[in-house]
Amino acid sequence: REAAVAVGARKTVLIDQPIAAVMGLGLKLDRMQGVLIVDIGGGSTKISVVSRHGVVNSHFSTESGMLMDEAIMNVILEKYHIRIGRKAAETLKMALGVEWDLNRDTRICEVCGISTITELPVKIAVTGEIVAQALNPILYRIFSGITSVIQMTPPAILGDIREHGIVLIGGVAQLKGLKELVLKVTDMKAHVADHPS
């Protein structure tokens, strides 16, 4: 608030983050009953239904992009005895995404790490299957939160959400396969905001 006044604002009003997100996305709530926003950021996930009257319901969790990176680092260490850094884990997460098909998945991504056996640098080719194994428990908890919010949403608003889709924002929103997975789990289409971060 002080920062806004310092740069010349005459009046400041604090608003809930989900409402700010709706405004920032340019969504017109006067034309619809409500919108479901899933904000998966680096440090937390916030799932909110916002209507023209404010936040209808929401769910907050610590599931995040950072936890996903740590899960990938742990799976690589456990399976290959190789330590990789957070940047390498994020590269794997964004390159390979969340979905893989056991019969067709040939996507791989190479990253460098340190062998815990030889303590020497090594390069490793990681498949989408390995990344999915790391991300699945976190995604399960995120989708449990989405399901919980959907179940608490009034039918009139839910009809609008079904028609317009779920809006994905935050750094993890661009994860390959995420919007397709949202559709599979919720039976509602999802789209990534133009500027999700």
Please report, for each region that a protein language model flagged, where it lies by residue.
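Nucleotide/phosphate-binding catalytic cleft detector across ATP-hydrolyzing
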Residues: 1-40, 48-166, 173-196
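Conserved Rossmann-like nucleotide-cofactor binding loop
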Residues: 43
